[in-house]
């Protein structure tokens, strides 16, 4: 059995998958925020419960936000303070007496989608998350591409390209990002960015679901906003595709639930690509909230 953990700032979610990659059981507990020992205990107790339930010693994979293992073997995860700065993989491997694998949660999302039965035909899969932030991952022949610093797929921290500024206006504000840089595309293409753009142009502080509801009702202002957002997304994605050239792009995160994101994006891309480039297949993520657990479990299928 394959055990996949999706660990965030508020919850530890475990999913148990069989050899056919089907979910058999899941459980969630709160993430301890202050005590590393309590954090380790929470993970180990879930593993012990799964081992007992299924009568086996399952493999363990963990997806977690941040850098899973720095050069000194410690985790960097600002949203999981109890474990950040600790040798999490080594400690769990020792306590559980098995090989524990860690990866960035966005890589686990991309891996989950790449291992979907409909998508395994594609050698290079790009996962793109349009949610609270913007991130993603790259999967080549079923394996995550992580890079030296585990920042492969941090698409949200690319800066706005020149043609985006031309489109939006040269006085368009380069917002300061939480990473310390200015003009990161996350500030404009995330769910929060979607709402910020609307307020910037129309001076109304609406949230993304409210704007989308207006769009569905045929509101002209909301429709103009979505057109502008999709044009901006196409410019930024075109730059990424020119570098990555994937066979498939799978879009997840809250904004992926808005059908226009996947249905109206492909037609906008050719003008932002090289003439010889082909637009990849673009699909909405298949596995929703289970994607993180699923991808983490499948870290043991990448050998």
From Swiss-Prot:
The keyword Kinase applies. Zn(2+) binds at residues 157, 177, 179, 184. The keyword Lipoprotein does not apply. Keywords: ATP-binding, Carbohydrate metabolism, Kinase, Metal-binding, Nucleotide-binding, Transferase, Zinc. InterPro entries: ATPase_NBD, N-acetyl-D-glucosamine_kinase, ROK, ROK_cs. GO terms for biological process: N-acetylglucosamine metabolic process; peptidoglycan turnover. It catalyses: N-acetyl-D-glucosamine + ATP = N-acetyl-D-glucosamine 6-phosphate + ADP + H(+). GO terms for molecular function: ATP binding; N-acetylglucosamine kinase activity; zinc ion binding. Pathway: Cell wall biogenesis; peptidoglycan recycling. It comes from the Bacteria. It is an enzyme of class 2 (transferase). Its EC number is 2.7.1.59. ATP binds at residues 4-11, 133-140. Catalyzes the phosphorylation of N-acetyl-D-glucosamine (GlcNAc) derived from cell-wall degradation, yielding GlcNAc-6-P. Belongs to the ROK (NagC/XylR) family. NagK subfamily. This is N-acetyl-D-glucosamine kinase. It comes from Escherichia coli O139:H28 (strain E24377A / ETEC).
